[in-house]
């Protein structure tokens, strides 16, 4: 009897693992990029809901995908912040953050929806999002307004991985980088989100090797690392290792004892730290 129960248990465990592995391989893009969650593809709030003047742009990538972007110019600014979003929601979720950078810090702001997010065309993938980033940097570097200003990257979670891709590939165009709760790689996050799949991480084709890209960033670019120590998705040691790996001679890390993955941004002192960084490095 005990043997039969054990066989049933083992059979169920094998079946569960097989299903989980198949899900990881075939549906990982929907897991990594939940652009559909909470109706984020159906409605996108706009900056005019807070009285922020903006220009809506359509950028076309190398593979002919149309991206929605918002250009918020501040004529008195000396810097532009490029906001790089996490993997859920849409750019409408960032209006309050736009407001802080634009009104409180006096910066120009540029933000765009990745392919497959918000009102942008296409389906998200690592390869595709990197083409999106190439397109945006090409636009900013040739734009008559933004090309005259310093460029600061602000990336949260997946947005941080995107920021590191940009900072490593376009190191001469990036003047500062702010990272929040960013991972070493997707493969190194899987064991913490899906423990049963820790032996199958090589099946993950969405890699985002932030750890590997960090070494290609400029040693002269200022970096600010913001880490929530109660992050339940990205283990805090990922941020600590990114900080330690960062070649910049001008880097700082701040850790928030009560910050989880999504609420580090509202922890006491978060925006004061960012303001001080921007002032100290001459961005505002």
From Swiss-Prot:
GO molecular function: palmitoyl-(protein) hydrolase activity
Pfam families (alphabetical): Hydrolase_4
Signal peptide (from-to): none
Topological domains annotated Extracellular: 26-80
Main location group: mitochondrion
InterPro entries per UniProt: AB_hydrolase_fold (IPR029058), Hydrolase_4 (IPR022742)
Cytoplasmic-side positions: 1-8, 102-284
Keyword vocabulary terms for this entry: Membrane, Mitochondrion, Transmembrane, Transmembrane helix
Membrane topology field: Multi-pass membrane protein
Family, as annotated: To S.pombe bem46 and M.tuberculosis Rv2307c.
Protein name, as recorded: Uncharacterized membrane protein YNL320W
Organism: Saccharomyces cerevisiae (strain ATCC 204508 / S288c)
């Amino acid at each position: 009897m005990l043997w039969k129960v054990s066989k049933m248990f083992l059979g169920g465990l094998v079946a569960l693992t097989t299903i989980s592995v198949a899900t990881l391989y075939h549906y990982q893009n929907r897991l990594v990029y939940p652009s559909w969650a909470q109706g984020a593809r159906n409605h996108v709030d706009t900056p005019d809901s807070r009285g922020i003047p903006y220009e809506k742009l359509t950028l076309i990538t190398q593979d002919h995908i149309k991206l929605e972007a918002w250009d918020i110019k501040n004529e008195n600014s000396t810097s532009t912040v490029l906001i790089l979003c996490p993997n859920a929601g849409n750019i409408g979720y960032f209006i309050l953050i736009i407001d802080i950078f634009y009104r409180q810090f006096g910066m120009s702001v540029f933000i765009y929806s990745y392919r497959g997010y918000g009102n942008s065309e296409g389906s998200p993938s690592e390869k595709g999002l990197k083409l999106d980033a190439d397109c945006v940097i090409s636009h900013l570097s040739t734009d008559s307004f933004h090309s005259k200003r310093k460029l600061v990257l602000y990336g949260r979670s997946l947005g941080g991985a995107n920021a590191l891709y940009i900072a490593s590939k376009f190191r001469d165009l990036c003047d500062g980088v702010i990272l929040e709760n960013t991972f070493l790689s997707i493969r190194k996050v899987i064991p913490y989100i899906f423990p049963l799949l820790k032996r199958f991480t090589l099946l993950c084709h969405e890699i985002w090797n932030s750890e590997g890209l960090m070494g290609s960033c400029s040693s002269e670019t200022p970096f600010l690392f913001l880490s929530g120590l109660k992050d339940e998705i990205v283990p805090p040691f990922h941020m600590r290792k990114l900080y330690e790996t960062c070649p910049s001679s001008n880097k700082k890390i701040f850790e928030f004892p009560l910050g989880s993955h999504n609420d580090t941004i509202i922890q006491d002192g978060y925006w004061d730290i960012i303001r001080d960084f921007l002032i100290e490095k001459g961005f505002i």
